C-alpha cells in the first residue's frame, strides 16, 4: 500500500527538518505544502526528499490540505495521513491509524487527542483548543 504523509507548513523552517527525518521511517512519500512561507521551509523540505508544493502566498490551512489531497491523488496514493509540521502529532500513532484502512474496515480514519482517558487535558486547555480550532475554520 502506497502511504503518503502530507504536511501543511507555514514558516516551519525551524521544525520541518526534524519532523521529516522522523517521518522518513514511516513513508518514503512525503508531501509538504509550503503555504506562502517567508523562511526556508520549502528549501529544507526539498533537500530532505519531500515532494514540495508551494503556494506563492498564505492561503490558509484548508487550502494547504486541499493541495496535499490533490498531489496525493496525482501520485496515486492508496492512503494519505496528514501531519502537522509543528510536532503536535505523535508519529507512533500513524501505524494505529492505518490499521483499519489496511484491513479494509474503513475508508477514512480521524484521530482525536480527546478519546484517550490516559491523557488528561484540563477543561481550560480543551476550551482553548476548541476556540482556536473554530477561529482557524472561520479565517481559512
Explain the meaning of each model-derived region.
Residues 26, 48-49:
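Short, structured coil segments at secondary-structure junctions
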Residues 34-42, 87:
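A conserved acidic beta->alpha catalytic loop
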Residues 6-26:
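Short, well-formed alpha-helical segments that are part of the catalytic scaffolds
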Residues 14-18, 39-43, 63:
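Residue-level preference for short helical/loop micro-motifs built around acidic side chains
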Residues 9, 33-35, 55:
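Conserved sequence signature across two-component system core domains
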Residues 55-74, 91-140:
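Acceptor/aglycone-binding surface of glycosyltransferases and processive sugar-polymer synthases
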Residues 2-4:
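Cell-envelope/extracellular polymer assembly enzymes that use nucleotide-activated donors
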Residues 77-88:
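Short beta-strand-to-loop acidic/aromatic patch adjacent to the donor-nucleotide binding site
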Amino acid at each position: 500500500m502506497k502511504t503518503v504523509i502530507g504536511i501543511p507548513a507555514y514558516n516551519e523552517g525551524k521544525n520541518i527538518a526534524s519532523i521529516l527525518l522522523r517521518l522518513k521511517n514511516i513513508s518514503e512519500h512525503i508531501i509538504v505544502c509550503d503555504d506562502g512561507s517567508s523562511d526556508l521551509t520549502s528549501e529544507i523540505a526539498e533537500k530532505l526528499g519531500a515532494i514540495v508544493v508551494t503556494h506563492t502566498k498564505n492561503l490558509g490551512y484548508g487550502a494547504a490540505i486541499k493541495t496535499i489531497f490533490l498531489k496525493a491523488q496525482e501520485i496515486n496514493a492508496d492512503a494519505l495521513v496528514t501531519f502537522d509540521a509543528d510536532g503536535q502529532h505523535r508519529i507512533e500513532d500513524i501505524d494505529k491509524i492505518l490499521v483499519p484502512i489496511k484491513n479494509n474496515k474503513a475508508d477514512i480514519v480521524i484521530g482525536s487527542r480527546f478519546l484517550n482517558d490516559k491523557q488528561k487535558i484540563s477543561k481550560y486547555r480543551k476550551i482553548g483548543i476548541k476556540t482556536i480550532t473554530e477561529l482557524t475554520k472561520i479565517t481559512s
